[in-house]
Amino acid sequence: MSAADLSGVSGWSAQKIEDFLARCKIAEEKVVFIRNTAFAKDKAAVLRFLHITERDFPDTFFSIKIEPSALDAEICRAASFLSCSIELDFTLSGADGKTFFDKKLYSRRAALLNTASLVFGVHLFYADTDGDSLKTFCDRLDFTANLYPNHIDFEQTESSENETHPTHVTALFSAADIRRARNIAFACRTFYSAGRAVPWFLAVLKPLKIQASRFFADFAEWQRLGSCDFRSGFTPEDVPHSEIEKMQLSFLKTKYDEKRLSHLFAVVRNIVRLNGAFARLSGEGEECVIETDFNPDDLLSPESSDIAAFANNVCMEKCAVKIFAGDDGPDYKIL
């Protein structure tokens, strides 16, 4: 069900919500996207919606955009009972002719979602507001990546004509800077979101001692040289995740070699491959057997969040690991 299906819904009374969901049930929708500005700001409507979906839609996945200012612990508790992703717009705000980015608000909302173990995504924009610049966009991206969102979306890279958030050249954001921002955004969309990198991204970034935006800028250049950048027409969501994983590992090896950290790359490769196998099991139901150089118990432990310490303290142990769907969810065993 597309966001366009909500265009005729206004007011969000209990009856209108019931009617909308009844249409979803008749259509046997398995994934429903909720994208409505008025709804996103209406806490009471969001709670009504969540309670109804918990009761009547146990097998449907909902992607629900909620205004950060409306999100609170009560909504998080209600959302925790259904299969969903909460989508948040992290935007610049304006007051008295100045723009600002409310890091305190956004970090608190992300903390609520992480505490409730909810999947959430963040939507970022660039050059759509007076006062924005390439530097402030990169700052927002760096800030967002550190909040552990499941995905970071950039609607402006999905369509050349974005009516909601059109880009425009200003004294602070040149046409060349807009192209750079677009390429960085597309690189993030490919590597982080399509690459399902959230479990390990910050861990592999730490030894490189660079910010996320710098990493994605370098990956954007790697994509350009490989003819899989924005201008090439490459669509990362249409590529099997296993192929994105190969791209990730190829680029990460380049970066680790560049920083003279080749001795750490075996750890990185094992962490990426094991987490990738779990991602494909969850996303595509794909069971597999992979070869690892370390015990999977170690690779999935908190110690793996510090790549350098892991390499120094954990002994290598060749394993054949089966990734499979267990009775209580994704599981693994050493063969």
Regions found by a protein language model. Name each.
Residues 5-173:
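Conserved non-cysteine loop/helix-boundary elements of the Radical SAM core domain that shape
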Residues 14, 43, 134, 171-178, ...:
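Generic detection of long, well-ordered alpha-helical segments
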Residues 36, 114, 146, 150, ...:
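Detector for Asparagine
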Residues 68-70, 167-173, 181, 229-239:
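Short, exposed beta-strand "edge-strand" segments with a Pro/Gly-rich flavor and a Y/T-containing core
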Residues 166-199:
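C-terminal accessory region of radical SAM enzymes
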Residues 186-335:
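Radical SAM enzyme core and accessory elements
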